[in-house]
Amino acid sequence: PSFAKAWYLKWAEKWVLSGYHYISVPFDRAKEAYEGLAPPTKITTIPQGVRLVDIDGALCRPNAVPTFCYAGIFYEHIRNPKFFLDYLLTLDQSFRFVVYCLEDTFSQEMLSSYKKLLGEKLLIKSPIDRESLIHEMAKMDFVINFDNDNATQRPSKLIDYAMSRRPILSFNCQTFRPEVFQAFLKG
């Protein structure tokens, strides 16, 4: 999703997809990604299934220092948080941004450069299992979702975010509004 496809892959995708009776996608806008590859009548929407996790309401309480988190992977071209981290550098107030992130090269190099600048305001954590993560997110004041910079892909983590029972702030570089973020910081 974060790089341009080679021209010949479209032919291979079309050939592979021709062998299926149906193609299922998790939400309607994802059908656009298959335009020209398969007839619209072959593409059906089947929402993702989930196992619900019960969260103890006692976990959900305000932190002394506004604390928020993101859990997932970053992509240089469709889910790049540099604009947000640059914004955080301008803040002259206490906060703690906890990031549970895969240890890929792009994410680690980018986050380590901001860690040097933000210090203890940025906590970088390795991925943990889904249920533990939902419990950790429940301890935050709110959670951050970086929307993809495209319309045909949507992060499945929003389901887990909702189970954490914490407010969700979603944005990308075009939709980020500092005044909305400040309102979340203030509770």
What residue spans do the PLM features occupy?
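Carbohydrate-associated surface elements
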Residues: 29, 49
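Short acidic alpha-helix that forms the nucleotide-activated donor recognition element
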Residues: 15-18, 129-140, 163
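Acidic donor-binding loop of glycosyltransferase active sites
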Residues: 21, 137-152
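Nucleotide-activated donor-binding/catalytic signature segment of Leloir-type glycosyltransferases, i.e.
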Residues: 65, 101-103, 108-132
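Membrane-proximal helix-turn-helix segments that form the acceptor-binding/catalytic region
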Residues: 3-23
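Conserved donor-binding/catalytic core segment of Leloir-type glycosyltransferases
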Residues: 60-78, 85
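Short hydrophobic signal-anchor/transmembrane segments that target glycosyltransferases
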Residues: 81-94
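Short hydrophobic beta-strand element within catalytic cores of glycosyltransferases
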Residues: 142-143, 160, 167-172
